[in-house]
C-alpha cells in the first residue's frame, strides 16, 4: 500500500488526519458567536457581516472537487500539507485583519486552504485502512470529528471571544496547523492515483468551481436583494449555465475532473444527496439557535457555547457507536434512523417559546439531535465512498465534502432569508411588535426550524429510495484485497 500499514502508525496517522479535519470544520461554526464582537471592532455593516461566514463557505465548497482531483494527480500528502499551510497562514491573517474587506478576503483564502486539505485527508484515510471493520471504525472516528466540529466551534468561539478576543478564534489554528505540518512527513507517506495519464481537466475545473461559487453567491445575495430580483435571477442563471457546461465537458473529457459514471452507484448518489441536506440543516441550525440563545434568551457568548456541549458530546458518543450499527444493519436503516431522529429534534426546537428553559426545552432536543447527526454522518461517509475505485478516491472524497459544504452554504443563506421574512411579516401583522423584539425573532426562528424539519424528512425519503439495501453482515466482511479503496457496495 502507499501508506504504512503498521498498526500503531496507522492509528497515529488517523489522529493527525482527524485533527486536521476537525480544525477545518470547527472554523465553519466558530465565528458564529463572535460575529457581534467582529461587527463592533471592525465596524461591519449589517449586510456585510454574513460575508465573514459566506466568503469561507463559497471558496471551501466551490473548490473541493478541484482539491480532490489535484490530490489524486499531484499527491495526497502534498495537497494535505499545502492545504494545512494555506489554512494556517490565512488564519493568522484573519486574526490581524484591520477592516471588513481584509477579514472577508482572508476568510476566502482560508476556505481555499480547507478545500485542498479536506479531500486529501479523507482519501489518505481510505488508502491507510482496507475496507471492512477497521475502515468503518476509522470512518466513524472521522465522522465524529466532522459531526462535532460545528458544535465544538460554537463553544470554543464563545470562550475565546469572551475571555481573550475574537482574533483568537483564528490564532488558535496556527500552532495546530504548524504541528500537523511537522508531523506529516513522519506519519504519512505520499500517495497518488494510479492513472494511465496525468492530464488535468482545466475546463471542467474552471466551470464547476465558478458555477458552485456563483450558486452560493447568488443564494447569499438573494437574502438581501430578494429571490425575484433581476440580479438574483441573473446570478442563478449564470450558475446554472456553468454547471450545465461542466456536465457537457465531463461527458466528453477523456480525463474528467468528476467521472460521472460514479453516480451509477446508488448508495454513493443517495449518500451525497443526504449529505447536502444534513449540511444545510447542521449549518443553519447552529446559526439560528446561536441567534435564538443570544437575541431571544439573552445568553452571553460563553453561555451560548456551553449550551451546545450536550449536542457535541452526543454526536461524539453516537458516532463511535454508529459504525457498529452500520456493520450490523447496513447503511440504509442507520441513515434513515439518524435523519428521522434529527427531524424529531428540530421539530421539538421549532416549538421553543420566548422564555425557553435550557433543561426542559433545549437539552432533550440537543441530545436527540446530536444522536441523529451521529447516526447520519457515519453511514453517509461510508456510503459516499461505496464502490469507488482507487483512482477516484480523491474526487469521491471531494464530492462528499462538496455536498456538505454547498448544502450548508445554500442552506444558511436560504434559511436566513426565510427567518428574516417571517420576522418582518410577524412584526407587520402585530401592531405592538417590532422586527427586533423577542416575539418577532422567535417566530422567524420557529419558521426556519420547521423548514429544516421538512428537509430532514425529505432526506429520510431519499435514503429509503436511493441507498441500496444490504445484508447485515456485509459491512464487516474482510477485504480480499488489502489495497482496495472501495467499500463494498453492500456496506
Model-inferred region functions:
Residues 1-9, 194-197, 436, 466-491:
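Intrinsic disorder in cytosolic terminal tails and internal cytosolic loops
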Residues 23-34, 59-62, 76, 169, ...:
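Short helix-kink/termination motifs in transmembrane helices of multi-pass secondary transporters
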Residues 1-186, 320-322, 329, 335, ...:
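Transmembrane-helix bundle of Major Facilitator Superfamily
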Residues 11-26, 31-33, 46, 203, ...:
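12-transmembrane solute porter fold
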Residues 148-164, 213, 217, 406-426:
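A gly/Pro-rich, aromatic-decorated transmembrane alpha-helix motif that marks the paired
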Residues 2-4, 181-209, 251-266, 327-328, ...:
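Flexible interhelical linker loops that connect adjacent transmembrane helices
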Residues 122, 174-193, 209-221, 238-253, ...:
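C-terminal membrane-cytosol helix-exit motif in multi-pass small-molecule transporters
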Residues 124, 128, 159, 183, ...:
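A residue-level signal for alpha-helical anchor/packing sites in multi-pass solute transporters
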Amino acid at each position: 500500500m502507499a501508506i504504512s500499514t503498521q498498526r500503531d502508525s496507522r492509528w497515529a496517522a488517523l489522529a493527525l488526519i482527524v485533527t486536521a479535519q476537525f480544525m477545518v470544520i470547527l472554523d465553519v461554526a466558530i465565528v458564529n458567536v463572535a460575529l457581534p464582537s467582529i461587527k463592533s471592532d471592525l465596524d461591519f455593516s449589517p449586510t456585510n457581516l454574513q460575508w465573514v461566514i459566506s466568503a469561507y463557505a463559497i471558496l471551501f465548497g466551490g473548490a473541493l472537487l478541484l482539491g480532490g482531483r489535484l490530490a489524486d494527480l499531484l499527491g495526497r500528502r502534498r495537497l494535505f500539507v499545502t492545504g494545512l499551510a494555506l489554512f494556517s497562514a490565512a488564519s493568522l491573517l484573519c486574526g490581524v485583519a484591520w477592516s471588513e474587506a481584509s477579514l472577508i478576503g482572508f476568510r476566502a483564502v482560508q476556505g481555499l486552504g480547507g478545500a485542498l486539505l479536506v479531500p486529501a485527508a479523507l482519501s489518505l484515510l481510505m488508502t491507510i485502512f482496507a475496507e471492512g471493520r477497521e475502515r468503518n471504525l476509522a470512518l466513524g472516528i472521522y465522522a465524529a470529528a466532522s459531526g462535532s466540529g460545528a458544535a465544538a466551534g460554537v463553544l470554543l468561539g464563545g470562550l475565546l471571544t469572551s475571555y481573550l478576543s475574537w482574533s483568537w478564534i483564528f490564532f488558535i489554528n496556527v500552532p495546530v496547523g504548524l504541528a500537523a505540518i511537522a508531523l506529516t512527513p513522519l506519519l504519512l507517506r505520499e500517495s497518488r492515483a494510479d492513472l494511465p495519464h496525468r492530464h488535468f481537466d482545466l475546463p471542467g475545473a474552471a466551470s464547476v468551481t465558478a458555477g458552485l461559487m456563483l450558486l452560493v453567491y447568488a443564494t447569499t445575495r438573494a437574502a438581501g436583494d430578494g429571490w425575484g430580483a433581476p440580479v438574483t435571477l441573473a446570478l442563478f442563471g449564470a450558475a446554472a449555465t456553468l454547471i450545465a457546461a461542466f456536465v457537457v465537458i465531463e461527458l466528453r473529457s477523456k480525463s474528467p475532473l468528476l467521472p460521472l459514471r460514479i453516480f451509477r452507484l446508488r448508495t454513493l448518489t443517495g449518500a451525497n444527496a443526504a449529505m447536502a441536506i444534513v449540511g444545510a440543516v447542521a449549518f443553519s441550525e447552529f446559526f439560528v439557535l446561536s441567534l435564538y440563545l443570544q437575541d431571544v434568551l439573552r445568553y452571553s457568548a460563553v453561555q451560548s457555547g456551553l449550551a451546545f456541549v450536550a449536542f457535541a458530546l452526543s454526536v461524539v458518543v453516537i458516532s463511535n457507536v454508529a459504525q457498529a450499527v452500520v456493520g450490523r444493519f447496513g447503511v440504509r436503516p442507520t441513515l434513515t434512523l439518524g435523519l428521522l431522529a434529527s427531524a424529531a429534534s428540530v421539530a421539538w426546537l421549532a416549538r421553543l417559546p420566548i422564555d425557553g428553559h435550557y433543561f426542559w426545552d433545549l437539552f432533550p432536543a440537543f441530545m436527540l439531535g446530536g444522536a441523529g447527526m451521529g447516526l447520519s454522518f457515519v453511514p453517509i461517509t461510508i456510503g459516499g465512498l461505496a464502490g469507488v475505485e482507487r483512482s477516484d478516491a480523491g474526487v469521491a472524497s471531494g464530492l462528499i465534502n462538496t455536498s456538505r459544504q454547498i448544502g450548508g452554504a445554500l442552506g444558511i443563506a436560504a434559511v436566513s432569508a426565510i427567518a428574516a421574512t417571517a420576522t418582518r411579516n410577524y412584526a407587520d401583522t402585530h401592531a405592538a411588535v417590532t422586527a427586533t423584539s423577542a416575539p418577532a425573532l422567535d417566530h422567524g426562528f420557529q419558521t426556519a426550524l420547521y423548514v429544516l424539519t421538512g428537509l430532514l424528512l425529505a432526506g429520510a425519503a431519499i435514503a429509503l429510495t436511493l441507498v441500496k439495501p444490504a445484508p447485515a453482515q456485509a459491512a464487516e466482511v474482510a477485504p480480499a484485497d488489502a489495497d482496495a479503496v472501495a467499500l463494498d457496495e453492500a456496506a
